[in-house]
Amino acid sequence: MTEHESLGLEQNQDGGDTYRHHNLSDGCISSVEDANEQPSSYEEESDDDMQYYERAIQEISSGDSYVCMICTVEMDYTCQMFACKRCYRVFDYGCIREWALKSTEKTVDRIWKCPNCYYVSKRVPVKNRPTCWCGKVVNPDPNPLDPNSCGQTCNASTCMHGCSKICHLGPHPECTRMVEIMCHCGKHSKSIFCYQSKVMKKNFNCQEVCGLPLSCSIHTCKKKCHPGLCGPCPEMIISKDSPKKQIKCYCGNHTRANIKCSETKFPKSGKSSKDENGNRWIGVFACADNRVVDYSCRKHSFIESCISPPTINGEKACPFLPSSLKTCPCGRTALEELTKPRKHCDDPIPTCDSRCGKPLKCGKHSCPFTCHDKACMEPCLQIDSVKCACEQSTFSVPCGFQGRPRCNIKCESLMSCRRHRCTDRCCSGRPSAIRRKKNLFRTQDLLDESLVEAKHICLKPCNLTLSCGIHKCQRKCHPGKCPPCLESDSNDLVCPCGNTVVPAPVRCGTKLPTCNHPCIKVVRGESTCGHKPMPHTCHSLDVSCPPCTETVFKPCKCGKKTKVRTVCFQTDVSCGIKCGIPLSYCYHTCQKTCHLPGNCQKVCKQTCGQKRLNCNHECPKPCHGKTECPDLPCATLVKIYCKCGRIKKSVTCGAKSDRVSVTESSVLDCNEECEALKRLKELKEAFGIKEETNNFTSNELDALKKLVSVATTFEELQLPFTEAALSVYSKQERWCSQIEAILNKLMDDKTRSSLHFKPMRPPQRHFIRELAKAYGLYSESQDREPMRSVFIKKEDNGASNKPVLSLAEAYPLYESFKQLQKERKAQEFQARTTAKLINFEVQDTEPKVEVAKKNGFLVQNLVAGNTAEDLRRFFEPHLKHTLVVNPQYLILDDGKTALVYPENYETASVNTERDMELLVGHFDFMAKEAFLADSISLCSTEEELERRLDTPVIQEDSPVMDNNT
């Protein structure tokens, strides 16, 4: 036995780290190695025959070889220890307690298992209460000779004597004390070892006849020495040939030749039986016949079973005699009141008109018939209100109805598995299910099948796939998760390269750990394409090796290029060139990129583009094959000019089969400006002055200046720019001029149709979009903050043009307009102002002003936590426009009342009081809405200060804050 047997493990002979589990359940170790690896000589095998638990004590005593399975730390005699009750594996006390606590928290049954043998236990080791092996001493002293032993006698109650070994680890030894046992019949005894008594006591048989008296007290037991009671007497009682000696029943009508002793029953009354002739006998059994016995009147009779003693004919008085029967059958009325007195027993018995009322056999009702002399109602047909089995409906049924009525309501209660529902109709378990649903709230109780009524225990097979993904759960349908798969394989689980091994037994669902060694195909240099395989780690066989990424040349799909650089595994090689093959059904070519021959596009999605017959414009309709273009008016925008070319206008072409283009048929008329421009041009040519590129004439500028003087709104100025753009230009002239130059450059570039600005702040983006309106450009903001930017694009209809004025030219006009607007408003305000001059005499004495009676605000039930600063923020915005000069804010000592009053509250006038009266209701409503105080009212500041403060003088350290703080 090796050093690792104390752990329940066996180490490989080469000193590796692979261990195999040993079976410790029967106290011995069975190795899973082959028999050839066992020691061949007796000396090697008996070198150390010490048990594994004794070896564990020796290793713990040395302190350098016994390892705790949980923390993997070497244990010595100073450690606090805990041993499994089944396998006696020793663990560190703190480790096993933490193991048990975590396990019980995760299981419904609050159990934990030994890490070595999986022994199930519910008792968690108590904190800081480790004991010795026998459990007598808590926190035993360190013992280097016998670790964790208290040195006292074990005295475990394995037998009547107790274990005599010193406190020890492992199973208790067999008790060798001598005890005396008796045989089953108690006649003989013998002495044996105590440990043999449990088996020998059951098997000790003297083989002699028992001889104990039986229950009849006549015969004795003839069985051989046996355990338990002797049983009923098996002896047979045989009658003699004489008729007087035959065995009779109680009534004497039947006899037997023999009978078992145990079947005889003497009458409890102790009286002998007697017939009409005076013959007597003792009956010992009851026959199955019934006798008809006559009453003393010999007119009536009754039926009697076999009893002891039997009734003799004619001896029993007739119950129908007039002397015996005094009332009607129901017993409510005397016969004397109903009819003449009866003289004989066979005279009819009169009945009354009362209800019978005798209790019926059902025990719940009484007979409903009128007084009668025959049997009462049987079965009982009176109607009862009875609930059905599920207690959801009530039915009216006869009392004698066999079985409970049933409704047609489906149960639909959850079964014990909490997956299926009960499909029975009128289920008797539904009331219990409803009560269970109301009472159970914890998940632990909901999963407890013992709390579910028997009717709703699901007996279907679970049949769910286990965690291994292969096998099915064999349990009946159950709540919660299925148990782990317990199937295992006796073969080692080996990776393809053979370097990573999971030794047998391999539990079902176990996956190979990641193998960091190279793949076997990389080692061998195998690949399907012939290139060197890509370096990669070992993987399972169901995962293919990574594709080859060696650079190669392959022909493309369309065949235009025979050498396209690509990787080896790529089969779909494309040159990226458009096909360009003319399509058979239209005038266009295939626009698909490199594709296989014959896979050209089936539907052409291009614009027709053919030249129209009546103008040079292209057909804008979608491709319509080789059919003629539709004869519709051309919708292309064209420009028509006057003769001198100054005036232009954008119109649709309108060319058609019966109509020429508008450019050929329409010419705009020149106006006076055209003539003036023509003369100006001739003068400039005569004087040698070069032509300036300014589209605005001096007359138009003069007209704009005149318009500024008469315009009343910005729209009447007819400037190309918006007011927002000109306002920004007035503040950021340089930056706005740069943006204007960028847009002018875009308009001059005929090859470019759009522009994307870099990300900017919102005000800058807004200016660009406002400026784009003057150019007739489409604009939009794109992306999210903070990368949001502006995108502008020329309109397709030719509406995008440079404005006739620049920002620099338009801004002076806008500035003049703003100045004129200010002057007009000042004049209008002065015109609406009326001055009234009144002459009055100046008095030498100053007028008397009435002093206010209420000169402050009283804040009551101030919410805790508010300060004078909070009061100032609440009142100041509303008081600064009133006559309340420099308001003061004072919170009184109780903390629930505050005063707000003007600094000159002693001389405040009634005008100040009027202002405060106008605001007090407003303050009261706002204080309640803001949860500042319960109410605000007017008060006399002098009276409140005198009544609430110790002195009327405001102290310097009081919480007062003026309006200028």
UniProtKB/Swiss-Prot annotation:
Keywords: Cytoplasm, Metal-binding, Nucleus, Phosphoprotein, Repeat, Transcription, Transcription regulation, Zinc, Zinc-finger. The keyword Transcription regulation applies. It comes from the Eukaryota. It is found in: Cytoplasm; Nucleus. GO terms for biological process: negative regulation of transcription by RNA polymerase II; nonfunctional rRNA decay. GO terms for cellular component: cytoplasm; nucleus. Residues 733-796 form the R3H domain. A zinc finger (NF-X1-type) spans 159-177, 216-235, 362-382, 468-487, 586-606. A zinc finger (RING-type) spans 68-118. SMART domains: R3H, ZnF_NFX. May play a role in transcription regulation. Present with 589 molecules/cell in log phase SD medium. Belongs to the NFX1 family. This is FKBP12-associated protein 1. It comes from Saccharomyces cerevisiae (strain ATCC 204508 / S288c) (Baker's yeast). The lineage of its organism: Eukaryota, Fungi, Dikarya, Ascomycota, Saccharomycotina. The gene is FAP1.
